[in-house]
């Protein structure tokens, strides 16, 4: 099965299934000398893990990470880092009714046709449980980026179903179960998600991800443009169906006189580009939006077929997120971090000696 490795110089290969013994990743290319412990990784895993509120899956996983290699006396050695997260709360009996049938909206049908076999327990490899390994790897990348450049990566939910969430400050993100940068709408969101769950249905979500203190010059035109790689990374997250960089689709209604970010000696006057021009970072904040589809596993009966092509009616039972987007913020942060560290290392490898006389204006306007 190809497609399990991400990156070129900082590579991450994930392994494991939803109901297997565990999952994890191998990180190769991490620079030596980075102080690293399980606690550095655990923080983001705890933000992503299931069972943290009534609005997400009630599967209870500790998601405790183990560092098996690549770290000696508290610092990375430059050799492969192996990270393991053991599964402890599998309930595979919940999936007996889908062993020979295909859930609408899931990867069951496509995995079966591609591989001729599939692990139907919780979706197997196609489950969003796999993203725990990405979050673990992303935590390592985030730590290196912060120490090297002061880079800070933040993600928050801006819409759940038809409920748009006003931005009131990033300090609120960690204080509610919705990863919302908002305080005043939390009770409304609680009631909304309760009604969605009781209706045996699900909703989608929209998230905003931003990276501050990104150095100018990251990105490899023409095929490995920074924005292209960010879009690739975000689309690789389960259930993501759309990506915007900067003004995104709003660019269609803007005039060139508005969209093009003007430059002055004091800095850029706007950031419609989302911090990327010509596929290369400008040094401004990078801004990304992603759209996540409604969770496909719902208890409402729906039409499908079995592996023999016979029509059936199927309801998916078990422990599922009524809005999978509510736990996507740490995953999106991780994927952006993995793109940035890979491009930082690629830039250093080829362009470390490049110097220009033009003053750096990029950080004066976010």
UniProtKB/Swiss-Prot annotation:
What are the record keywords, sorted? Answer: Amino-acid biosynthesis, Aromatic amino acid biosynthesis, FAD, Flavoprotein, FMN, Lyase, NADP
- InterPro entries tied to this protein: Chorismate_synth, Chorismate_synth_AroC_sf, Chorismate_synthase_CS
Identify one Pfam family in the record. Answer: Chorismate_synt
Q: Which residues form a coiled coil?
A: none
* Cofactors, names only: FMNH2
Query: EC annotation?
Result: 4.2.3.5
Q: Which residues bind FMN?
A: 125-127, 238-239, 278, 293-297, 319
User: GO CC terms on record?
Assistant: cytosol
Catalyzes what? 5-O-(1-carboxyvinyl)-3-phosphoshikimate = chorismate + phosphate
A biological process from GO: amino acid biosynthetic process
* GO function term, MF aspect, one: chorismate synthase activity
Stored SUPFAM superfamilies:
Chorismate synthase, AroC
What does the entry list as the binding residues for NADP(+)? 48, 54
Q: How is the cofactor bound?
A: Reduced FMN (FMNH(2)).
> Which pathway does it serve?
Metabolic intermediate biosynthesis; chorismate biosynthesis; chorismate from D-erythrose 4-phosphate and phosphoenolpyruvate: step 7/7
Keyword Flavoprotein in annotation: yes
Under HAMAP family, the record lists: Chorismate_synth (MF_00300)
Per the record, the similarity remark reads: Belongs to the chorismate synthase family.
Protein function: This reaction introduces a second double bond into the aromatic ring system.
Protein name stated in the entry: Chorismate synthase
Q: Please tell me the species this chain comes from.
A: Neisseria meningitidis serogroup A / serotype 4A (strain DSM 15465 / Z2491)
């Amino acid at each position: 099965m190809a497609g399990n490795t991400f990156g070129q110089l900082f590579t991450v290969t994930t392994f494991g299934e939803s109901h297997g013994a565990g999952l994890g990743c191998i990180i190769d290319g991490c620079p030596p000398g980075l102080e690293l412990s399980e606690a550095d990784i655990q923080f983001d895993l705890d933000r992503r893990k299931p069972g943290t509120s009534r609005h997400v899956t009630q599967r209870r996983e500790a998601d405790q990470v183990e560092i098996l290699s690549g770290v000696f006396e508290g610092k990375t050695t430059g050799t492969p880092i192996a990270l393991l997260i053991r599964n402890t709360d599998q309930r595979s009996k919940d999936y007996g009714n889908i062993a020979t049938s295909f859930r609408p909206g899931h990867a069951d049908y496509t995995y079966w046709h591609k591989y001729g076999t599939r692990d139907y327990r919780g979706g197997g490899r196609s489950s969003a449980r796999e993203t725990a390994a990405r979050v673990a790897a992303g935590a390592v990348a985030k730590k290196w980026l912060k120490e090297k450049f002061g880079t800070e990566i933040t993600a928050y939910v801006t819409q759940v179903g038809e409920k748009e969430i006003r931005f009131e400050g990033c300090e609120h993100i960690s204080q509610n179960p919705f990863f919302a940068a908002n305080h005043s709408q939390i009770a409304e969101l609680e009631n909304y998600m309760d009604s969605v769950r009781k209706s045996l249905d699900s909703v989608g979500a929209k998230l905003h991800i931003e990276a501050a203190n990104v150095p100018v010059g990251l990105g490899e035109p023409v095929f490995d443009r920074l924005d292209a790689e960010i879009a690739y990374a975000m689309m690789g997250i389960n259930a993501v169906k759309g990506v915007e960089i900067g003004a995104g689709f709003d660019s269609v209604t803007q005039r060139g006189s508005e969209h093009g970010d003007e430059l002055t000696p004091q800095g850029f006057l706007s950031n419609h580009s989302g911090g990327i021009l010509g596929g290369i970072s400008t040094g401004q904040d990078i801004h990304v939006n992603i759209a996540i589809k409604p969770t496909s596993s719902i208890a409402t009966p729906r039409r499908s077929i079995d592996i023999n092509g016979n029509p059936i009616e199927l309801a998916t039972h078990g422990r599922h997120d009524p809005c999978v987007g509510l736990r996507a913020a740490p995953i999106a942060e991780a994927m952006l971090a993995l793109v940035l560290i890979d491009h930082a290392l690629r830039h250093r490898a080829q362009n470390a000696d490049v110097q220009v006389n033009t003053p750096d204006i990029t950080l004066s306007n976010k």
